């Protein structure tokens, strides 16, 4: 059997656990091989570290960010003869799932595009390890993934309106245990820093000693539980008490239709985030739509 791993680095983000043992020890079975995404341990991504943001899952480690799909292929019964070239054709199959998160931002007041920092997106409940032989997910430990929106993912759609589309490549996401939870697996968190000119009592902009405008800065954040949407997407399958990865060639699109509203008069110094506005906790299912 010949195996190919598609990503390699001195400290690989993607690795196959027990691969060396399998190659050199006949007692090790293919059922002992696990594909895993490296976690960051006690560290946090640079986009999160140092930012005083609400942490809905402080005990969960972050996975290293996967910026492209994960492909895997196996060739069995290969006959390689010494001194002769051997050409192998691999039928690479995508085994990761691509989840697209779509949400909108609306600003009110004197907030310009340059006043908005790139949003930070976090998704919890990510699986980091699964068995290659039977695609059974290891859910004994779940992780979270973080991504900062890139310029091509953040577009202005109108006066004071913006649209974000971000992508996560994952081995599977476990939904929340209940719709009303805002911690644990399956929680989507959005945070972005907003600046707005500071005004004096007469409404005139405040400037510093050098004549530069003084701005107030604040993190706006919100969390939402797309329980029904993750369940409907069928990212996982439960059989005989085990959880299996469900392969899908199609992306899963989770769209939050209720915009995150940012009001200039609420950007004040030394304050906490205003949360997801508007938000109706009695009707959480009305906030998100899904396209598979």
PLM regions with names:
Residues 3-19, 111-236:
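Tryptophan-paired
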Residues 215, 221, 226-292:
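Extended, compositionally biased alpha-helical segments that mediate assembly or anchoring
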Residues 83, 160, 200-204, 208-212, ...:
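Intrinsic-disorder/low-complexity loop/linker signature
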Residues 85-87, 98-100, 161-163:
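Intrinsic-disorder/low-complexity, polar/charged segments enriched in Ser/Thr/Lys/Arg/Asp/Glu/Gln
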Residues 92-107:
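A short, Gly/Thr-enriched small/hydrophobic beta-strand-prone motif that recurs across taxa
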Residues 3-95:
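Short, low-hydrophobicity acidic/polar segments
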Residues 80, 91, 111, 180-182, ...:
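Generic marker of residues within folded, mature protein domains
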Residues 81-85, 157-159, 233, 257:
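Solvent-exposed, conformationally flexible loop/turn segments
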């Amino acid at each position: 059997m010949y195996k190919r791993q598609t990503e390699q680095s001195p400290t690989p983000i993607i690795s196959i656990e027990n691969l060396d043992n399998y190659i050199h020890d006949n007692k090790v079975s293919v059922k002992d091989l696990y594909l895993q995404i490296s976690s960051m341990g006690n560290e946090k991504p640079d986009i999160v570290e140092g930012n005083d943001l609400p942490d809905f899952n402080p005990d969960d480690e972050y996975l290293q960010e996967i910026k492209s799909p994960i492909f895997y292929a196996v060739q069995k019964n290969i006959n390689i003869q010494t001194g002769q070239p051997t050409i192998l054709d691999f039928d690479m199959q995508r085994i990761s799932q691509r989840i697209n998160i779509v949400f909108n931002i609306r600003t009110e007041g004197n907030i310009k595009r340059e006043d908005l920092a790139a949003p930070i997106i976090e998704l919890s409940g990510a699986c980091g390890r699964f068995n290659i032989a039977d695609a059974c997910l290891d859910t004994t430990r779940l992780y979270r993934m973080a991504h900062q929106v890139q310029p091509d993912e953040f577009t202005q759609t109108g006066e004071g309106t913006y649209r974000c589309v971000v992508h996560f490549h994952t081995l599977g996401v476990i939904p929340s245990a209940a719709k009303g939870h805002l911690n644990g697996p399956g929680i989507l968190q959005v945070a972005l820093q907003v600046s707005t000119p500071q005004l004096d009592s007469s409404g005139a902009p405040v400037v510093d000693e050098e004549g530069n405008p003084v701005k107030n800065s604040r993190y706006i954040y919100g969390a939402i539980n797309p329980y029904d949407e993750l369940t409907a997407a069928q990212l996982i399958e439960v059989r005989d008490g085990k959880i299996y990865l469900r392969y899908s060639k199609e992306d899963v699109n989770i769209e939050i239709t209720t915009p995150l509203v940012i009001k200039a008069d609420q950007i004040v110094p030394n304050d906490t985030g205003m949360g997801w506005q508007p938000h109706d906790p009695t009707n959480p299912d009305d906030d998100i739509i899904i396209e598979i």
